[in-house]
Amino acid sequence: FSFKRLKGFAKKLWNSKLARKIRTKGLKYVKNFAKDMLSEGEEAPPAAEPPVEAPQ
């Protein structure tokens, strides 16, 4: 087990197409969420994108 290999694997994973897609989607979601919070105050986000909450 080597950290060097793990780092290389993580880098490969980070630069993969899937990861890039997830990152851009995540970034868009965060931006939209922040915009909604600023413009609408305490209103909940749309049901199409449920907020991520810890299970109770």
Curated annotation (Swiss-Prot):
Keyword Membrane appears in the UniProt entry: yes
Function: Causes cytolysis by the formation of pores in the membrane. Causes rapid and reversible paralysis in crickets. Has antibacterial activity on the Gram-negative bacterium E.coli (NBRC 3972) (MIC=0.4-0.8 uM), and the Gram-positive bacteria S.aureus (NBRC 13276) (MIC=13-25 uM) and B.subtilis (NBRC 3009) (MIC=0.8-1.6 uM).
Protein name per Swiss-Prot or TrEMBL: Im-1
A molecular function GO annotation: toxin activity
Entry keyword Membrane: yes
GO biological process per UniProt: defense response to bacterium; killing of cells of another organism; monoatomic ion transport
Record's signal peptide: none
Tissue-by-tissue expression: Expressed by the venom gland.
Keywords in alphabetical order: Antibiotic, Antimicrobial, Cytolysis, Ion transport, Membrane, Secreted, Target cell membrane, Target membrane, Toxin, Transmembrane, Transport
Family, as annotated: Belongs to the non-disulfide-bridged peptide (NDBP) superfamily. Long chain multifunctional peptide (group 2) family.
Subcellular location: Secreted; Target cell membrane
Gene Ontology cellular component annotations, sorted alphabetically: extracellular region; membrane; other organism cell membrane
